[in-house]
Amino acid sequence: FPTVHRNLALAYYNVKKQPQRAYEEMEKAFALDETDARVYLELDQLKKRMNIPVSERLEDMEKHFTLVESRDDLYLEYVTLLNTLGESEKALNLIKARKFHQWEGGEGKVAAQYLTALYQLAKAAAAEGEYVEAKTILLQAVDEYPQNLGEGKLESAQENNLYYLLGLAQEKLGETEEAFASLTKACHGESEPVGMMYYNDQPPEMIYYQGLAY
């Protein structure tokens, strides 16, 4: 009865505060039915809470990739792990290859990984002196989102990091006016850190890029 072990896992974690016992029960639940993508997602989320190394989680997901492909939230978690480990080109290709459908609690998450992948690729290109490539990638990042992401860009989107790096690339290319415009955009936003209550609130780290842009 895999569901019994899954429910026991939730009780051990949420009520008894025994994460290791919860992990053991969730592993049993999945072992009894390795076709249950939801239980696999919950197992991975438990691994995240228990600080299981990202590389281990990624390796396990690759062993169960059919399950990963069956759910948008699992697929996006896999992409997130790739971005975390610096495999941004692979992450971006996987994002482009899938048609996402928004789910409750998932607002903004697909776009966030899309932008993370592009930013990291642009940063790597700039570090190698490939400023034209970096600029091309960043112009893609600040443009409208591809339709397959399942969500559009909000007017309040905070892209200070993107515009800051774009401004630097344009500056290196001798595009003075364009660089000034980009760095000016990088200065926009709240100047004091506040707690993020909603997915579209300004991330505190954007203030750092505002400071750099000034």
Cite the ranges covered by each PLM segment.
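Residue-level recognition of tetratricopeptide repeat
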Residues: 10-11, 45, 80, 123, ...
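Specific register positions within alpha-helical solenoid repeats of the TPR/Sel1-like families, i.e.
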Residues: 13-14, 47-49, 83, 119, ...
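Structural signature of tandem alpha-helical TPR/SEL1-like repeats
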Residues: 15-28, 50-63, 87-93, 133, ...
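Conserved structural position within tetratricopeptide repeats
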Residues: 27-31, 63-66, 100, 143, ...
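Short coil turns that delineate tetratricopeptide repeat
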Residues: 34, 69-70, 103, 146, ...
